[in-house]
Structures are given as structure tokens and as C-alpha cells.
């Protein structure tokens, strides 16, 4: 279904954003 694909896309974007935030935090600390 369409909404399933949308959820997949949103999940991917959220995951990438979370990874980016973690990398930024780790980079700022070191």
C-alpha cells in the first residue's frame, strides 16, 4: 500500500537524521 511506502521513507529519513545528530554530538565532544 502507498502509506506503507511512505512510512518506510519517513523511517529512513528519521534514521538518517538520528545518525547525523549522533555523529554531530560525538564530533563536538571529541
Swiss-Prot record:
Q: Which GO terms describe its cellular component?
A: extracellular region
Keywords linked to the UniProt accession:
Amphibian defense peptide, Antibiotic, Antimicrobial, Secreted
Report the superkingdom from the record.
Eukaryota
Compartment(s): Secreted
Record's Pfam families?
DD_K
Which tissues show it?
A: Expressed by the skin glands.
Q: Which GO terms describe its biological process?
A: defense response to bacterium
Name the job this protein performs: Antibacterial activity against Gram-positive bacteria S.aureus and E.faecalis, and Gram-negative bacteria P.aeruginosa and E.coli.
Family assignment from sequence similarity: Belongs to the frog skin active peptide (FSAP) family. Dermaseptin subfamily.
Which protein are we looking at?
Dermaseptin-DI4
Amino acid at each position: 500500500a502507498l502509506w506503507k511506502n511512505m512510512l518506510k521513507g519517513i523511517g529512513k529519513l528519521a534514521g538518517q537524521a538520528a545518525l547525523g545528530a549522533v555523529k554531530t554530538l560525538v564530533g563536538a565532544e571529541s
